[in-house]
Amino acid sequence: HRVIGATGSRSFAELATQGGVDGVLTITKEVELDIEPLDPMTGLANFSGAYSFAVQAVEVDVDSDTGKVTVLDAISVHDSGVVVNPIGFESQVIGGMAMGLGAALGEELLYEQGRPINPSYLNYPLPRAADLPPIRPLSVQGEDPHGPYGAKAVGEIVLIPTAAAVANAVAHATGVRIRELPLTPDRVLGALRQDQAQSRSYGLAGRPSRWWIAGIRSLYPRGLQKVLHR
């Protein structure tokens, strides 16, 4: 392999030999981030030179008899600047979203009299590879002049939107908004039954917020889909 630069090319071995001092590779590069320190008068600061952005969506199946939520498909799109290592990017996104799905659907520390009753991996439900849906990591391949080599972070940001994406998908599938995590079967089933009981008692007239849901569902097969997708 040869490294090509502005003044020519050299083999990787030649470059390593030139950069080594006493057998230690010493070629380094520093990137000075454009940040703003804390202003004691305003309390404002900018501790990052570049900010990443992400959006996620999932497709779910909700069993109305058991309350079990199954994620069928997942996509995670990121503005992480220049992706220097595509394989590392994809692995990071898949791993981060797997953690997010675990937090959204099952991970929870349970306590009894102030003591955790599921403190080990024997009884703490982490998702396994076989539990995961297809996860599609995508990058918009932007470039940020403030990031090293135009790159931006793709770390914790993967985990942040996952639970919201799952909760939104469940709400879209059932019409019931659940605002507490994780979305365990008992919690989902309880919310569905409570919603059914309220619907029988009050109907649409007693819950105006559901008029638009019922209207969209009735109009969609009657041509609304074509209007929205023009």
Protein language model features and the residues they cover:
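C-terminal catalytic domains of large/alpha subunits in multi-subunit enzymes
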Residues: H1-R230
